[in-house]
Amino acid sequence: MPHILAPSLLSADFTDLRSAVGLVDDSPAQWLHLDVMDGVFVPNISYGIPVIKAIRPLTRKVFDTHLMIVDPDRYVTAFKEAGADVLTVHLEACTHLHRTVQAIKAQGMKAGVSINPHTPVSALEAILPDLDLVLVMSVNPGFGGQRFIEGTYRKLEALRELRQRTGSGALIEVDGGVAADNHRKLIEHGADVLVAGNSVFGAPDPRAAITTLLS
């Protein structure tokens, strides 16, 4: 199966989100990655439900919505109504993870769980069969443009093995420091979905960058 590319809106020009969404919409990238940060779970604040709702009419691309927030259960319905297709919560932010995952699915969205760099893959074993996606953070969450953590490759391999052992059909996504010089290696180690922010929106030719990252 060809891998999926999800350009991250966090690295776009916030004064012209219409053009940024249009660029992705006109490209072969399959998803648009939306990073929602609350300034509590991570040391940054990005954007939220009103922005997602505003840009939803601009594209039919999959809205891959990554919640870096505390108490995500409170907002599941609101993100569905805003237009999220995939809703990913952090394992580290959920008290009752299984309940949260089931709430996401009950709204008709795909359910994802993300793990920070310090969280071992083994922490996902019980929940993995219930997931549509696992998001592996290859940088510490909160800011775009950070340096890629090399230990991510081992983590992807371990997750691929765990997925096979548990019979899960979850896609493996990686977010942070994805670029033209490592994207093929990430795929070889198990990634199905690549999130790319700076390497797309910070490139001299974003459309060419998307083509390269899909190769």
Residue spans for each PLM region:
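Conserved N-terminal beta1-alpha1 strand-loop-helix module at the mouth
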Residues: M1-T88, E92-H96, A103-A106, K110-A111, ...
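Solvent-exposed beta-strand sheet faces enriched in polar/charged residues
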Residues: H66, S114, E173-D175
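Short, acidic/turn-prone active-site loops that include or flank metal/cofactor-
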Residues: E92-C94, N116-H118, V139-G142, N198-F201
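Short acidic, Gly/Pro-enriched loop/turn segments at secondary-structure junctions
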Residues: P141-G144, E188
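Glycine-rich beta-strand-to-loop/alpha-helix junction loops that act as flexible
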Residues: V174-V178, V195-N198
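Acidic, divalent-metal-coordinating active-site segment for phosphoryl/phosphodiester hydrolysis
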Residues: G177-H189
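Acidic, Mg2+-coordinating phosphoryl-transfer loop and its flanking beta/alpha structural elements
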Residues: H189-A196, F201-G202
